[in-house]
């Protein structure tokens, strides 16, 4: 097995193992707040870094040359943003819900051959910056989606009066609502900055890619505006965050 594939396999096992252990601990009632819960995320993130560094060395640039690499890079951005925002929003279980999504995003990279493609020409600074900014924006939308899932689970448990171990560990609903709005807003701003770089790139960009990306930006900007004006209920906000993430995820398949 080639080393890059081995790194992905190890990272998937670490993320999946951390998720399984957390669920078992919550179910058994033994879950306690501890920095040790970050360990699987830190180890998995390190393995992701090693994979991306290896692929970057092969390509001689940011490893975003095929769809499997794009998915791994988005997963890496999701974990990075989790480290930055998890504590700030008091979302202690965000990592638990993040881990399976990140593991799934790495799955295509493990099963799909990733052939190194030579650069047709030297890329400009703005071209190097363009794609990573898009991935960071999409990662923010992914975290909003995960926060939305947590909100909907808690809302369901409240409505069904199923107050068990998981309910007591989930963050308060108002924390989740704030996290959704802020992550959607952050994603919109980063994606807008990315679209701004397109005016500084001399080489023509695919029309389909431009239409899809502007579409994603426009729809998320409209959703963010509705959230800021408090015209949506908390549940509808969560559903928009969850279902809305299908749009950027689907656009990656189409563009690729």
PLM features: residue spans?
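Surface-exposed beta-loop interaction hotspot
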Residues: 123-137
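Glycine-rich, flexible loop/turn motifs
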Residues: 60, 122, 166
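Membrane-helix interfacial "entry" motifs
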Residues: 1, 62, 123, 127, ...
